[in-house]
Swiss-Prot record:
Catalytic activity annotation: 3-deoxy-alpha-D-manno-oct-2-ulosonate + CTP = CMP-3-deoxy-beta-D-manno-octulosonate + diphosphate
Biological pathway: Nucleotide-sugar biosynthesis; CMP-3-deoxy-D-manno-octulosonate biosynthesis; CMP-3-deoxy-D-manno-octulosonate from 3-deoxy-D-manno-octulosonate and CTP: step 1/1; Bacterial outer membrane biogenesis; lipopolysaccharide biosynthesis
The protein's enzyme class: transferase
GO cellular component terms attached to this protein's record: cytosol
Protein name per its UniProtKB record: 3-deoxy-manno-octulosonate cytidylyltransferase
Enzyme Commission number(s) of this protein: 2.7.7.38
Alphabetical keyword list: Cytoplasm, Lipopolysaccharide biosynthesis, Nucleotidyltransferase, Transferase
Entry's localization field: Cytoplasm
């Protein structure tokens, strides 16, 4: 199995769900669920990069998880993880998986898959995708879509429905046209620790600013991103109170099995 470490950015002041890492899911803080998922995936180290002591305190019961207290001024999770990597002292060739702090149902196989995609590909960065199941998801601007080339590398990420099915969508936008498969991006990333520092040092790109998608900075700078298909279902992360309610229902369903 590919050796890797997991870093989880956990900022307290989330705009759409303030205090998100500490919101309770099944009676426990959200960040605790995410950290356990990383441990279950077999990561050599699991770090949570945060800017708030309350989040660090919530993790005190997980001895295997380390906490990096990072600056409150970081503009993005990538910047926060770059500081975490420096604190951890990872060598430049260390495989780092960036697991978002709002992914309490991230499957262990998916976490391992993004690390494997990095090692097996020729790109300095990797990520995951899964199939879009319905038209509502495809047209939702909060759901990021992507297209990839024959080398399984990302060509573009967008909040818009890509590729645009000219004839099919002219007929209806209520159902997905037959004969084409769309991909939903899963916001988990893999990179070597050295490239993570490069990424954080790059200036924001024009497309990144238009779409508000940080990964576009890498494509605009001319670097490829390997895209693997998640080997297991990868439920969407938690961004809103409604998402948290759905997550609570899913947790209860899983517990009843």
């Amino acid at each position: 199995m590919t050796e890797f470490v997991v870093a989880i950015p956990a900022r307290y002041a989330a705009s759409r769900l303030p205090g998100k890492p500490l919101r309770l899911l099944g009676g426990e803080p959200l960040v605790l669920h995410v950290a356990r998922r990383a441990l279950q995936a077999g990561a050599g180290e699991v770090w949570v990069a945060t800017d708030d002591q309350r989040i660090a305190d919530a993790l005190s019961g997980l001895a295997e998880v380390k906490v990096a207290m990072t600056a409150t001024s970081h503009a993005s999770g990538t910047d926060r993880l770059a500081e975490c990597a420096r604190i951890a002292g990872w060598a430049d060739d260390t495989v780092v998986v960036n697991l978002q702090g709002d992914e309490p149902f991230a499957p262990a196989a998916g976490i391992r898959a993004v690390a494997q995609a990095l090692v097996e590909g020729n790109a300095p960065m990797s990520t995951l995708a899964t199939a879009v199941e319905d038209a509502e998801t495809l047209f939702d601007p909060n759901v990021v879509k992507l297209v990839r080339n024959v080398r399984n590398e990302a060509m573009y990420f967008s909040r818009a429905p890509i590729a645009w099915h000219r004839d099919g969508f002219a007929r209806s936008r209520e159902v997905l046209p037959e004969g084409h498969a769309w991909l939903r991006h899963i916001g988990i990333y893999g990179y070597r620790a050295g490239f993570l520092q490069q990424f954080a040092a790059m200036p924001p790109g024009r497309l990144e600013q238009v779409e508000s998608l940080e990964q576009l900075r890498v494509l605009e700078a001319g670097y490829p991103i390997s895209v693997a298909i998640s080997p297991e279902p990868f439920p969407a992360g938690i961004d809103t109170p409604e998402d948290l309610e759905r997550a609570e229902a899913l947790l209860q369903t899983l517990a009843a099995r």
